[in-house]
Amino acid sequence: MCGIVGYIGDSEKKSILLEGLKELEYRGYDSAGLAVLSANRLEVFKTQGKLENLRTELKNKEFLNFGVSIAHTRWATHGKPSSANAHPHFTENLALVHNGIIENYASLKKELENKGHAFLSQTDTEVIAHLLEETLKSEGDLLKAFEKSISLLKGSYAILMLHKRAKESLFYAKSSSPLIVGKGKEGVFFASSLSVLAPKVDQFVILEENSVGQISLENFKDLNNIENMKDYAFENKDYSKGNFRNYLEKEIYEQHSSLLECLEGRLEALSVYCEIDPEFLENVSEITLCSCGSSYHASLASVYLFERLAKIRARAILASEYRYAHFKSNPNELFIAISQSGETADTLEALKLAKAQGLKTISLCNAPFSMMSRISDHTLLIRAGVERSVASTKAFSSQVMLLWLLSVYLGKQLGTISKEEERIQAKNMLNSVKAMKVEPKLHEKIKRLSKRYLHGHGFFYIGRDVFYPLALEGALKLKEISYLHAEGYASAEMKHGPIALVDSNLFTIALLSKHLLFDKTKSNIEELSARDSTICVLSSEILEIADDFIQLEESESYMEEFFRMNLAMQLLALEIAMRLNHDVDHPRNLAKSVTVE
């Protein structure tokens, strides 16, 4: 959610910090700030809104001498978006930035106020600064005082702090929130994402859970688990928008390539392979898939595939529910955690709970150095590449594709799928990749059609079987970027309540599969049409009662239809949001990586 950058060294700090924050900008934020300590002079700058506002504030500033510095992009959790609530938070002698949530901040704040501390913001983070100031009254050693202050915090945090008494060091603390430190020719760098550090450092350390410490240029070498950056391939790809109007449009168009990357080395001569030892999958009798948001919709879709193809019981559970609902597990259960970032707080905590129960665990994520990838028994990378837009497109499609492949691979290992069926599914996967190539005629038709769907009191997205989770995803995509109300439903559920909302001002986006339950879904569409809903049908089969019809190319399988419909719904959401003049890359109130509960 929030982004952290830190730097110790001689180089000009403003450009380093702003460049780092720019790299983290796609995660979502509502304010930004930085602090520099050099020659006993502490300067703090904070602005609300876009990073460009902070850049303007610093237009005539340069920080050339040796010093320590921190920077932050904030996504509001405690306190409204404002300059006062932006990070860094500071006192006369220190400044700090924080990602996460301090759960006991209210009680700590009350204690500190009773001792005479005055607060300038509504945030939980400012409590940490005053807590350290208070602790230093009784503990003279700065590091010990910092450690003692951190020990009083309950919640999740990644913290960077600078202090006038330690002009060559940064202090850090990490618990359930990512923080990485690296060293390069220009000095020591901190960030909440390795992508920020990759071009700048030769060595790096992913800080251990519950670690607290002090870093300078000299003592970096004393850290545990130092890794060499040259051992890892970070492609220097062009992440500019190019000729596209926004990153979301670019990423929709990139899905054909990202799906090919997802299948690279996993699909050879119509046989499926996976980076999981077959012995690990022996005796698996049940699968639990745990995730949030679009990843949850990918999980729901895969339940149909695991049950149908691998002939194994599967269930998808929201990570936030799994943690507290006391679901019963069994010794032969396989737990699959799914998260684009690999740092989603609820999914990460659910994964830890599954590990504590002794379950076999697999993580599906897009980040090889994420916390989830480090604590799972196995990790499968979706290889979707960077998504700059907050709304998930490439990641969702790659998650579904990889889960589909995993269902076939598992069936292969368990002996529940024939060699012929494996070949059929492999061919269907390749056809589905081709289906994700955007045809200009399709995009142009959807662009023209979108102007009809700007006003009304809401949208129903409906589908059956595997197209029900896809309907949920289509509705979420529209909600996220257009701010229009949309709900996804299993088609047959219309009669159980939702149909009461139907009138001429309600739009229905109907996913009509030729290969699965065509007649049943057609009947559900007719029920809505009879009550005057405006019907937009996505199908290869023409339906006369449709008010609008997005005709898809013929598909050889229902999963190929799935990907064709997914692409069309993404384009429809994009064009509606563009007509409404919304910032589709940075929707309001949303963050790319949700690292707090």
UniProtKB/Swiss-Prot annotation:
Compartment(s): Cytoplasm
Gene Ontology molecular function: carbohydrate derivative binding; glutamine-fructose-6-phosphate transaminase (isomerizing) activity
Domain Glutamine amidotransferase type-2: 2-218
Listed Pfam families: GATase_6 (PF13522), SIS (PF01380)
Keywords assigned by UniProt, alphabetized: Aminotransferase, Cytoplasm, Glutamine amidotransferase, Repeat, Transferase
Record EC number: 2.6.1.16
Top-level class of the enzyme under EC nomenclature: transferase
UniProt xrefs under PANTHER family: GLUCOSAMINE--FRUCTOSE-6-PHOSPHATE AMINOTRANSFERASE, ISOMERIZING, GLUTAMINE--FRUCTOSE-6-PHOSPHATE TRANSAMINASE (ISOMERIZING)
Quaternary structure (record): Homodimer.
Name used for this protein in its record: Glutamine--fructose-6-phosphate aminotransferase [isomerizing]
